[in-house]
Amino acid sequence: MNKFWSPFVDSLEPYVPGEQPREGEFIKLNSNESPFSAAPAVIEAIKAAADGALQLYPEAESSELRDVVADYYGIKPEQVFVGNGSDEALGHAFNALFKHEGKKLVYPDLSYSFYPVYAGLYGIEIETIPVTEDFRINIDDYCALDSTEISSIIFPNPNAPTSVALTLDEIERLLKAQPDILVAIDEAYVDFGADTAIKLIQD
């Protein structure tokens, strides 16, 4: 069977998920899981959708959902992408936005371990920047990057697995310092202790 794999697969490093205890009841914040069940109205909506609609394709543009999300965050519907979980959205971002011949994607050396997996999968050159001794992202390191060599920057906020967050002022300073570099803020854990940068989109 191995003879059918594409040659580049040999160079890929598999994603290694965080520790997942199999016994006992834990609140797994590292997996972004909630200890609470969905609201009763949500459960009822899921049941209603499952009754007679599962055999149909959903509306391709997810217009109604995008309208609601856009209204909640104060942005435009065309600025909302709906996917099957954040990993799918990340995969599209890596393939569509970060892949530029002769330029690198930059992220912290201690960060979400799926980043190098996607970079390898899509053939994206990478450069990592060390976090500080207290596990912080030094925004000055990113402000000093050369846009002729770097296409894009990505980091979680708060960072994973360190949980240390950047302030909006720091993120805004980076955006102003690097107008020619795409900056992606991965906010998978933003509700645990950081301010969303979505409001900066309109600036």
Can you say where each PLM-predicted feature lies in the sequence?
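Phosphate-binding glycine-rich loop
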Residues: 63-104
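PLP-dependent aminotransferase-like
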Residues: 96-155
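Conserved active-site segment immediately N-terminal to the catalytic lysine
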Residues: 196-203
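Short, structured coil segments at secondary-structure junctions
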Residues: 76, 122-123, 178, 203
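Active-site phosphate-binding strand-loop segment of PLP-dependent enzymes
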Residues: 133-192
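Short glycine-rich anion-binding loops that position phosphate/pyrophosphate groups of nucleotides
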Residues: 32-35, 86-87, 112, 157-161, ...
